[in-house]
Amino acid sequence: MSAKPEVGLVREASRQIVAGGSAGLVEICLMHPLDVVKTRFQIQRCATDPNSYKSLVDSFRMIFQTERLFGFYKGILPPILAETPKRAVKFFTFEQYKKLLGYVSLSPALTFTIAGLGSGLTEAIVVNPFEVVKVGLQANRNTFAKQPSTVGYARQIIKKEGWGLQGLNKGLTATLGRHGVFNMVYFGFYYNVKNMIPVNKDPTLEFLRKFGIGLLSGTIASVINIPFDVAKSRIQGPQPVPGEIKYRTCFKTMATVYQEEGILALYKGLLPKIMRLGPGGAVMLLVYEYTYSWLQENW
């Protein structure tokens, strides 16, 4: 009798891993070029720098001219490798936190929001080492052929700085803030608004309903969490003076950026981030939901 719930849980987790991995892979392949542009904007510090990008269009033009097409896919391997466990953690833990919060007298709106926060914090712990490698590779402006491999770069970090908070887990507090805040808003907004708007019987209109809510969820979450994202990129990216660590902790980095560069510097890369995580967030939710629904019917 006790074996049935265990089998059910294993099957449910397996479905979420497959559906979440599919959602992550599709989103990464479609949206990664915008992530490269976003990271480049966030790590540049001075408009007078001859290597700085003047606009979104200018960044695309310069990257293509100097690094060619593959320049837009720098650092793509770490997020691809991380997507299956990351999305599995994201969606599976969200459901588990939601079930756990069901034992507490909370409103559905608060339940979705807190469950999203919990899933984001858990996700951040899993994904942070991959983010450290990804940001380092994206910050490299050499041609694709001249940059180190993903594994080679990870080995360099481990050899020089180790596995800890100065090495492969550098910027963990900022990553916790970035993912915790994003998932809190992303899941909280999506499921609350989706439950408020009636389901449409027409499949096309229903698809558009979900896509529109997902688009808004990703956009709003991106606007709210981007200061954490900027702090993460500064901590994990190249430091202004080689060998001297300027950016260490999340909130101290935010304060330094604000004092030296102004409030708008905390929103660097917002446009490419919204362009990526607005539609990307919608794509991810829809791919996950439709894949998971198909797996429920066929497996």
Swiss-Prot record:
Predominant cellular place of this UniProt entry's protein: mitochondrion
Catalyzed chemical reaction(s): 2-oxoadipate(in) + 2-oxoglutarate(out) = 2-oxoadipate(out) + 2-oxoglutarate(in); hexanedioate(in) + 2-oxoglutarate(out) = hexanedioate(out) + 2-oxoglutarate(in); L-2-aminoadipate(in) + 2-oxoglutarate(out) = L-2-aminoadipate(out) + 2-oxoglutarate(in); glutarate(in) + 2-oxoglutarate(out) = glutarate(out) + 2-oxoglutarate(in)
An example Gene Ontology CC term for this record: mitochondrial inner membrane
Sequence ranges of the Solcar repeats: 11-100, 107-196, 205-294
Transmembrane segments: 17-37, 70-89, 113-133, 167-187, 205-225, 277-297
Membrane topology note: Multi-pass membrane protein
Subcellular localization(s) per the UniProt record: Mitochondrion inner membrane
A single BP term in Gene Ontology: lipid transport
Keyword annotations of the record: Antiport, Lipid transport, Membrane, Mitochondrion, Mitochondrion inner membrane, Repeat, Transmembrane, Transmembrane helix, Transport
GO molecular-function terms, A-Z: antiporter activity
Matching Pfam families: Mito_carr (PF00153)
Family: Belongs to the mitochondrial carrier (TC 2.A.29) family.
Function: Transports dicarboxylates across the inner membranes of mitochondria by a counter-exchange mechanism. Can transport 2-oxoadipate (2-oxohexanedioate), 2-oxoglutarate, adipate (hexanedioate), glutarate, and to a lesser extent, pimelate (heptanedioate), 2-oxopimelate (2-oxoheptanedioate), 2-aminoadipate (2-aminohexanedioate), oxaloacetate, and citrate.
Protein name: Mitochondrial 2-oxodicarboxylate carrier
